[in-house]
């Protein structure tokens, strides 16, 4: 028996079947950086239309988690796809480097500033610590295959960025949005500092729920307001009843608030057993629930009054020797409580607003550490949360406590310490939302932005409509200074603040933020002014640092120095987690509108949080944390990247070992498809072997047309950031259009046709065109694998797939083409029907394999007309040794019905000899002298001109 193996076109490639990504990716990464891939991309795209995705800076503390990986990979995929679409799309990664978490880490090692270490030394230690954290995170991001300006990222602690943050403050002040005020702000007693809205998270907390009596100072004046019948004005002490869950704020109480339009009832509590007679004022709607919880069963109503009638009546503070007024406020409701609100202007935003209206004292008896100040009567030196019990004791002693019980409710907590926070009035700097129309302008600008998903617009609108002034000052050491001078007596800003800010910014540019604390005011403004003005020693909220990066980074770095007419906004796209509507998206919008009068971004795209396979948050205690490093070490970054791109990331994104295993399986299918292409391009030189499109075999033309259609859909999905649609289309193309049909059909031709003949070269031309497109579709997502494929592809090419653009060599089938998509769809349906009967015949041992079969198709006239177009090449499409087509009228009894109407098929085992080269059973095997074991087709392919293929 002769060995015909050497006469076959066997697949051959250096592209391995197994990716072995965990080991091979680091080698590829090294080459990318050794050969300056990012620099090559920048050179290739210079002068192209710009696309700016501005990186929201992660905090420079700790290892990256799976949420960071999701975020950075999404950004990288978008940047790479934009690059392939012909944009100059630089990526400058950033880090948020100031603020409390870094201070706390340094405090652990070095002690608090001003104690064991000077403030200047402390700042230097913070800078070093942050720099180390940036380096660690940077290496982790690079390992994920994320390309960018890693050698020159932006860090909010870079001297130039710090200087620009200070300039931003100057611009906002110059536009009239800066405000100094003594206001209640979210205050963390552990941080010892104010918190921004975005630094507050809500958790359930158990608090004491108390109803407290404030006795009327002038009983007759109070009774006169109620419609009580003469002589029936009741008996016992007369009080209003307030409800609160923060007893510790009662020392700061300066009023009781009612709603002007609510009806209030004067209730007579009857003497009964131990219950003394007393009279209580409550909102009519809530009276029964208040009395029920106080276990008061015997009572009746004496009279009614409108809230507006009770304004300015005086009531005694429950434990201090002064009276407080009844005031009116829109914030009073009957949702819960008593309909009368305890008002402490120093401890609540609504209390503060209504307190200003009535010119109430903004009492603040609480220090920055949450402890009552030394002059706080009854409670000095106690921590507020521990003082709740003391307050209750005093209320009981004074007979002012009507009722109390434990109450679980949602309460603001510090996002860092996870501890309850307080509202505390302190002198702070604010960006005013209303004094110069900032809120209205910001809401207007929201409408000009494309929000993806669309619900993001309503979300941020609601937040901006309801948000308080932005408190931008912090009482911390490691932060950008609020570089302002205020008059020692009037507290007014220096009239030349803008010029002074520029002088300070220049110093900071040279020496960093320490320059502010070192510089003598006289150096900047002369001795005379310096005697009257003092430096502000507060630092800026870190959300201000990151919020103004549209100016401090995007408007300032040379990478973004694009023509002005291209840039309607500082950035085209911001892409972060959905929690950033209340964080970075909002701080960026407010600061940009305050500085420039417009939004900083054209589009805002959000992704959901990462959860486990059961939809639970990642938690070390549950043990469901998936660390990026573990995934890259075990499966490789491309699997992680494919997981990211396969998910509808606008919702919660699930990850688990099982989900990653599914990504690995999908990856293998794509890799095997690419390997088939490469292996079958062995010996193909595109410079000399390309077959002109019009001369290609019909099926090859169809395959290129399918790639053309897939490419259009894939580019559209990339443009719309619908990455899961990209992966779905890619999988469908590889598994269904190619794997289940085209690649299956062409194996015979590819392996057995004459080496270098038209039949093989037509097929290779199609494979070449398709792999040129496929490698580019993959590149943004499976970057390492695309690079590997690129280096195995035939022909002259650029060094990297990432510097090019989408492949332009594909073509669609011509209008009116005979062998069009519809034709091949019908043929695939015929093939699928025949395959089912071949499987059944194999199961019944009628045949061993499909090539042992001869099939007869009995079809209606319309189907025959289509099938017969393939002439004697139908058998190659069906993968059988023979295929005959006959009209339905000639159908035999042995022919079986198929799923297709009008098609019956008869399957018989071929009695012809098997060709030892192509394995087809054909009558002419052994009929040609010198080739006793092979068929005539194979002899032609070995020694002759080669078979002719027109259709398949």
Swiss-Prot record:
Q: Where is this motif: 'KMSKS' region?
A: 617-621
**One Gene Ontology term from the biological process aspect of the record:** isoleucyl-tRNA aminoacylation
Q: Mind telling me which PROSITE patterns this protein's record contains?
A: AA_TRNA_LIGASE_I (PS00178)
Subcellular location, in the record's words? Cytoplasm
The gene for this chain is ileS
CDD domains listed in its UniProt record: Anticodon_Ia_Ile_BEm, IleRS_core
Q: Which of UniProt's keywords are assigned here?
A: Aminoacyl-tRNA synthetase, ATP-binding, Cytoplasm, Ligase, Metal-binding, Nucleotide-binding, Protein biosynthesis, Zinc
Q: Where does ATP bind?
A: 620
Q: What's its EC?
A: 6.1.1.5
**Which reaction is this enzyme known to catalyze?**
tRNA(Ile) + L-isoleucine + ATP = L-isoleucyl-tRNA(Ile) + AMP + diphosphate
The short motif 'HIGH' region is annotated over: 58-68
Free-text cofactor note: Binds 1 zinc ion per subunit.
Q: According to its UniProt record, which cofactors does this protein need?
A: Zn(2+)
Provide the domain comment: IleRS has two distinct active sites: one for aminoacylation and one for editing. The misactivated valine is translocated from the active site to the editing site, which sterically excludes the correctly activated isoleucine. The single editing site contains two valyl binding pockets, one specific for each substrate (Val-AMP or Val-tRNA(Ile)).
Identification of the protein by name: Isoleucine--tRNA ligase
Positions binding Zn(2+) in this chain are 915, 918, 935, 938
Native source organism of the sequence: Aliivibrio fischeri (strain MJ11)
Claim: Protease is one of the keywords in the record: no
> Which cellular component appears as one GO term in the record?
cytosol
Q: Which SUPFAM superfamilies match?
A: Anticodon-binding domain of a subclass of class I aminoacyl-tRNA synthetases, Nucleotidylyl transferase, ValRS/IleRS/LeuRS editing domain
Family assignment?
Belongs to the class-I aminoacyl-tRNA synthetase family. IleS type 1 subfamily.
**Which residues of this UniProt protein bind L-isoleucyl-5'-AMP?**
576
Which Gene3D superfamilies does the UniProt entry name for this protein? 1.10.730.20, HUPs, Valyl/Leucyl/Isoleucyl-tRNA synthetase, editing domain
């Amino acid at each position: 028996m002769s060995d015909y193996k050497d006469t076959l076109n066997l697949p051959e490639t250096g592209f391995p079947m197994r990716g072995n990504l965990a080991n091979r990716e680091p080698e590829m990464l090294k080459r990318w950086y050794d050969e300056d891939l990012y620099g090559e991309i920048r050179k290739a795209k210079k002068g192209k239309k710009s696309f700016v995705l501005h990186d929201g800076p992660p905090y420079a503390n700790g290892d990256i988690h799976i949420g960071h990986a999701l975020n950075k990979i999404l950004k990288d995929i978008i940047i790479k796809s934009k690059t392939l679409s012909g944009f100059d799309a630089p990526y400058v990664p950033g880090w948020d480097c100031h603020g409390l978490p870094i201070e706390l880490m340094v405090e652990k090692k070095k002690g608090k500033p001003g104690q064991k270490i000077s403030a200047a030394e402390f700042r230097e230690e913070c800078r070093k610590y942050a720099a180390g954290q940036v380096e660690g995170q940077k290496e982790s991001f690079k390992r994920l295959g994320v390309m960018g300006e890693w050698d020159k990222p932006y860090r909010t602690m870079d001297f130039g960025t710090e200087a620009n943050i200070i300039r931003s403050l100057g611009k906002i002040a110059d536009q009239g949005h800066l405000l100094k005020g003594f206001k209640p702000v979210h205050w963390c007693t552990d941080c010892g500092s104010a918190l921004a809205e975005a630094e507050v998270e809500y958790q359930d907390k158990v608090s004491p729920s108390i109803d407290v009596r404030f006795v009327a100072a002038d009983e007759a004046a109070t009774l006169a307001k109620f419609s009580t019948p003469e002589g029936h004005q009741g008996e016992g002490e007369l009080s209003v009843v307030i409800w609160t869950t923060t007893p510790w704020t009662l020392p700061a109480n300066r009023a009781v608030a009612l709603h002007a339009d609510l009806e209030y009832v004067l209730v007579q509590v009857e003497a009964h057993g131990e219950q003394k007679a007393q009279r209580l004022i409550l909102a009519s709607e809530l009276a029964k629930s208040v009395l029920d919880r106080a276990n008061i069963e015997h009572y009746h109503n004496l009279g009614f009054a409108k809230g507006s009638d009770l304004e300015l009546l005086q009531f005694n503070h429950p434990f201090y020797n002064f009276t407080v007024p009844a005031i009116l406020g829109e914030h009073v409701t009957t949702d819960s409580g008593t309909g009368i609100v305890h008002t402490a202007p120093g401890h609540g935003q609504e209390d503060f607003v209504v307190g200003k209206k009535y010119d109430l004292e903004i009492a603040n008896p609480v220090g920055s550490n949450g402890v009552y100040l030394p002059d706080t009567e009854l409670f000095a030196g106690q921590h507020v949360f521990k003082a709740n019990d003391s307050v209750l004791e005093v209320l009981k002693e004074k007979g002012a406590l009507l009722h109390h019980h434990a109450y679980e409710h949602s309460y603001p907590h510090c996002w860092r310490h996870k501890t309850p926070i307080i509202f505390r009035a302190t002198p702070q700097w604010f960006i005013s939302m209303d004094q110069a129309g900032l809120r209205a302008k910001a809401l207007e600008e929201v409408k000009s932005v494309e929000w993806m998903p669309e619900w993001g617009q309503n979300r941020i609108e609601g937040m901006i409509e309801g948000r308080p002034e932005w408190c931008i000052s912090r009482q911390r050491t490691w932060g950008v200074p609020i570089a302002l001078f205020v008059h020692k007596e009037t507290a007014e800003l220096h009239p030349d603040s803008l010029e002074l800010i520029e002088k300070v910014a220049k110093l900071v540019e040279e020496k960093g933020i320490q320059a502010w604390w070192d510089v003598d005011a006289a150096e900047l403004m002369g001795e005379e002014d310096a005697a009257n003005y003092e430096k502000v020693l507060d630092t800026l909220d870190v959300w201000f640092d990151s919020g103004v990066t549209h100016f401090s980074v995007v408007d300032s770095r040379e990478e973004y120095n694009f023509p002005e007419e291209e840039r309607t906004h500082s950035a085209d796209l911001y892409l972060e987690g959905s929690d950033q509507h209340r964080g970075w998206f909002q701080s960026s919008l407010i600061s940009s509108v305050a500085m420039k009068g417009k939004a900083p971004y054209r589009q805002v795209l959000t992704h959901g949080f990462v959860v486990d396979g059961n939809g639970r948050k990642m938690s070390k205690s549950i043990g469901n944390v998936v660390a990026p490093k573990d995934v890259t070490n075990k499966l490789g970054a491309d699997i992680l990247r494919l997981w990211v791109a396969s998910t509808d990331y606008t919702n919660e994104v699930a990850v688990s070992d099982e989900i990653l295993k599914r990504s690995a399986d999908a990856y293998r299918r794509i890799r095997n498809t690419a390997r088939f292409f490469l292996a079958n391009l062995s010996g193909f030189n595109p410079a000399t072997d390309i077959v002109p499109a019009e001369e290609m075999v019909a099926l090859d033309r169809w395959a290129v047309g399918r790639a053309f259609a897939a490419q259009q859909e894939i580019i559209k999905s990339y443009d719309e950031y619908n990455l899961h649609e990209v992966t779905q289309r890619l999988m469908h193309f590889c598994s269904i259009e190619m794997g289940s049909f085209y690649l299956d059909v062409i194996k015979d031709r590819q392996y057995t046709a004459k080496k270098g003949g038209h039949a093989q070269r037509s097929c290779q031309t199609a494979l070449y065109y398709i792999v040129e497109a496929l490698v580019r579709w993959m590149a943004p997502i499976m970057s390492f694998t695309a690079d590997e494929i690129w280096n195995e592809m035939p022909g002259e090419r650029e060094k990297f797939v990432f510097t090019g653009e989408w492949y332009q060599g594909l073509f669609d089938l011509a209008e009116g083409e005979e062998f069009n998509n519809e034709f091949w769809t019908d043929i695939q349906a015929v093939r699928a029907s025949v395959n089912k009967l071949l499987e059944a015949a194999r199961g019944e041992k009628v045949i061993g394999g499909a090539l042992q079969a001869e099939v007869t198709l009995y079809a209606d006239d319309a189907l025959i007309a289509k099938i017969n177009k393939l002439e004697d090449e139908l058998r190659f499409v069906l993968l059988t040794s023979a295929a005959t087509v006959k009209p339905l009228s000639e159908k035999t009894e042995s022919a079986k019905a198929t799923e297709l109407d009008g098609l019956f098929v008869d399957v018989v085992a071929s009695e012809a000899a098997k060709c030892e080269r192509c394995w087809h059973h054909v009558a002419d095997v052994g009929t040609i002298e010198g080739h006793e074991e092979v068929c005539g087709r194979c002899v032609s392919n070995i020694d002759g001109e080669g078979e002719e293929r027109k259709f398949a």
